A protein has these predicted regions:
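AAA+ ATPase active-site-proximal loops
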Residues: 1
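Active-site neighborhoods and metal-handling regions in enzymes and metal-associated proteins
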Residues: 4-613
Length: 613
């Protein structure tokens, strides 16, 4: 059905970026020809292989106009291609429309990834270029493996986008701060000793760290160098006797310097990390995660050293939250729940009465979060998606491009989170604004059934996220539905909202769900041109029961408490067990959140958490 022009703004102004993007690609090709480069790769990386980037490193966004958080562009003499996953297909099609860039949908059978594309389309004597300061060693190794049967040269010293990007933003210069032990639960010295214990098990003399969240975790420092991700750009190096932090020292105040030194951490300039690595004695064993170390730093490791590769030691340690962190997380989710309920009440009272758009709704939600003590910033850009915009999983409303006005009809998906001193939050609710279709109600209820099926599961110790993923998809599969993304991801503690190594996904993962791991559960239904539905809660893995015949079993303990919109639930599709779960959950929502609300908000919440049968 066509949208009435006087009711809604157009979703995307197609073609706005076209000429600019094509001009940039043309300029890039000229540079490539000058440097003897046949194909040039522009990934979504910074020197630390971060998922979310500071503006300075958004080279792929600059060259393509595609603003999603994941994707790779390859430019050759006669083609420009963008690869991205199912979360962004709709968004990517809109944002590159009219330009010469082609979209290759990652994960679709028969669609080559960019490694396969380069292997199949380049010939002997050709060359591949990339910026080795941002390209991870693991990707270089994979590229070498794919191209090994051809005489193709790798040229890794040129940041060609940097040469073209004349108004490139400066590198971030935010101040670092110390995360108090009352939040972290352990001092930096204690964490460094835990790292050394793991180094001993791996026979490692040194542990080289490039990933910002791991560095922030082990040294108990945080910063504002990346929007929504409280990290500070730096490198780390830990030996059996010493620990170093390489950082722009202007970012450190006296308190932070003193804390680091008290905890056995030496400080030096950011640019000197490679000098330190080059001086490591021959015969020493250096542990690295090749997916989190860039090619330039990898090349600084002396030839006489043995390189031990694996997942960062800190990745596994920080994934299992300690009791202090978990208790703080519970406090953060109460605060977040209060903000969400106040927002939902405000929305209910004002949609159709005052002008509310996707953008202004997201701003209002942030306003409610900022009222909570200890709130620092959002944990990611709020996804406030009305009607068919919600079919784009990581949609972002923007003034002048896409910004629907909310009406008293349809579904409104809000996926948001906050950074608090007590932890990082993430929550999604799909809200009924007025009349909805039977199809929308059915899809919402099927999503809810999948959510309940997984969140209430008991599972044997040793289970991985890929083992339990099917539980959330099963009700959808029975109706011929699925979602082209994972079901859940780990969440950091005042760190990245996406954290590994665990996840819940169809993609095989051998990481066991351990007690203390925090993870999201967020099944959904996404129908292009119609609607998007997602229900997300955050849980912590906990012990359940131990039996003579089964052994040790685990469960999910819920952290987030926000009402699930009953107006979208078809009770006839729910089992008695599912109804009981929903009633019990809503009872907890009311009991935990209502003490922090006004009288009118409490009355509203009581109705929204009423028992169903």
């Amino acid at each position: 059905m066509m949208l009435k022009a006087n009711c809604y703004k157009y979703r995307i102004k197609k073609g706005v970026m076209d000429l600019k993007v094509n001009d940039k690609i043309s300029s890039l090709r000229k540079l490539m020809k000058e440097r003897g480069i046949t194909a040039y790769i522009i990934p979504t990386y910074d020197p630390h292989q971060s998922e979310y980037l500071s503006d300075h490193y958004k080279t792929r966004v600059w060259i393509s106009g595609f603003t999603g958080s994941a994707g790779t562009v390859v430019v050759t003499e006669d083609e420009a291609i963008l690869w991205t996953d199912g979360r962004y297909w709709i968004q990517a099609e809109n944002e590159i429309a009219g330009s010469e860039i082609k979209l290759y949908k990652s994960g679709i059978p028969g669609v080559p990834d960019y490694f396969e594309y380069l292997r199949d389309n380049l010939k002997d004597g050709d060359s591949v270029g990339f910026d080795g300061r941002i390209f991870p060693q693991s990707d270089v190794k994979k590229l070498e493996d794919y191209l090994k049967n051809k005489d193709i040269k790798l040229i890794e010293e040129y940041d060609l986008i940097g040469e073209l990007w004349k108004d490139r933003p400066e590198k971030p210069k935010s101040k670092a701060f110390v995360l108090d032990v009352k939040y972290a639960g352990k001092t930096a010295r204690e964490k460094i000793e835990e790292v050394r214990e793991e180094m001993d098990k791996k026979a490692a003399d040194y542990f080289l760290l490039g990933s910002l969240d791991d560095i922030a975790w082990v040294y108990n420092i945080r910063g504002r160098d990346v929007a929504n991700n409280p990290v500070v750009i730096s490198y780390g190096l830990i030996s059996k006797d010493n620990a170093w932090l390489f950082i722009d020292q202007d970012k450190l105040d006296d308190e932070t310097r003193a804390y680091l030194r008290e905890n056995g951490v030496e400080i030096d300039d950011y640019e000197k990390v490679a000098d330190y690595v080059r001086k490591i004695e021959k015969g020493k064993n250096i542990f690295i995660d090749p997916s989190r170390i860039n090619r330039w730093l990898y090349n600084s490791i002396p030839e006489g050293c043995k390189i031990i590769e694996g997942t960062n030691i800190t990745t596994n340690l920080k994934a299992v939250k300690n009791p202090v962190e978990i208790e703080n997380q519970r406090k953060a989710y109460i605060k977040d729940g209060v903000a969400l309920v106040k927002f939902m009440y405000w929305l209910d009272q004002n949609v159709g009465r005052i002008n509310i758009t996707e953008v202004s709704a997201a701003e209002k939600l942030e306003e409610f979060r900022r009222q909570q003590e200890g709130f620092i910033e959002p944990s990611f850009d709020t996804i406030a998606a009305y009607k068919e915009n919600a079919a784009m999983m990581h949609y972002k409303a923007e003034e002048g491009k896409s910004n629907y006005e909310l009406k008293k009809e349809g579904l409104f998906l809000v996926d948001s989170g906050g950074q608090y001193f007590e932890g990082t939050t993430d929550i999604t609710r799909t809200i009924v604004l007025g009349s909805i279709t039977e199809e929308e109600k059915r899809d919402f209820t099927l999503t809810l059934k999948g959510h309940i099926n997984l969140i209430s599961a008991r599972f044997l110790y040793g289970t991985t996220g890929s083992n339990v993923d099917v539980l959330s998809r099963y009700p959808l599969w029975q109706e011929g539905l699925d979602y082209k993304c994972g079901t859940g991801h780990g969440v950091g503690f005042l760190l990245n909202v996406h954290e590994g190594p665990h996840r819940i996904s169809t993609i095989p993962n051998d990481v066991v769900l351990e007690k203390g791991m925090v993870v999201t559960i967020e099944p959904g239904v996404y129908k292009e041109g119609k609607h998007g539905i997602r229900i997300e809660n955050v849980v912590v893995v906990d012990d359940d029961i131990e039996t003579e015949y089964g052994g040790k079993f685990m469960k999910f303990d819920i952290l987030s408490f926000v009402p699930i919109d009953l107006e979208a639930v078809d009770v006839n599709l729910l089992t008695k067990k599912e109804i009981n779960w929903l009633n019990n959950y809503h009872r907890e929502v009311y009991n935990r959140i209502s003490p922090y609300l006004s009288e009118e908000e409490r009355k509203w919440l009581k109705e929204k958490t009423r028992e169903i049968c």
